[in-house]
Amino acid sequence: MQTKGLILFDIDGVIRDVTNSYRLSVQKTVLKYCNWEPSTYDIDVLKNEGIWNNDWDLTLELIKRFINKNKLSLEPPSRDNIIKNFEKLYFGCHPNESHMKWSGFINNEKLLVDTKFFDFLNLNKIRWGFVSGAELPSAKFILENRLRLNNPPLIAMNDAPDKPNPEGFLKLANKLLEKDFGPNCPPVAYVGDTIADIQTIINAKELYPSQRFISIGVIPPHLKTAENFQKQSQYESKLKAAGADLIIKSVIDLKNIHKELFKA
């Protein structure tokens, strides 16, 4: 089968809604250690700096900044303690336990796409895969158990350096296309909801300027409410300013623009 192009997807905020799971784990972990619960806007502000792709590091940074801003005589927790508390909230137990035992916030996650979407991509000769900073058990659970995808191509946490380092993205793209990057290689798109995702593609373009890479920003679910309309518009502007080639409201929108996306 001749490949028209390749689309790699982030998972959190793109494939699943993590408003009441990962983001809630961030909020409740910060609350535990400094008696302040950040809003989703506070989290977005930090993520928009483009370097806080790891939610554990983001959580610790929120705590440190709050302590410093308010001149509190508190000692920030260790990163290990952040991780332990975070995973207790998110999984409800150790992540290596059977997912049947998971009782945490992960059970709150809603899918933003269905299996038929990937059947559509296959039918249209578009290859696909996932590059995410999520832990492997969590990523595999959403892709294999919830979406019922068979052995989906995946780069997860610890498989490669954190975004915006493009190593994981380039590694999976090269593996799936089985070609050297360049003008004769099919276009490669990446769909993500943060500035770090956009910056990942900018960094990839710098390494392989003759390869066509496309950065696609998607609006995260927590902003898709009437009361957040202005914030949604501001967020979209930030993604564009960061260098996004295209902004979409939902991954499903790709079904309507896939032909234009990979047009020579």
Question: What positions do the PLM features span?
Answer:
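Active-site neighborhood of HAD-like aspartate-dependent phosphohydrolases
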Residues: 1-45, 51, 57
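Non-catalytic pre-domain segments flanking phosphatase-related domains
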Residues: 1-9, 61, 68-84, 88, ...
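Helix-loop "lid/cap" segments that line or gate small-molecule binding pockets
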Residues: 27-33, 56-72, 172
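Structural recognition of alpha->loop->beta junctions
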Residues: 125, 147-158, 226-258
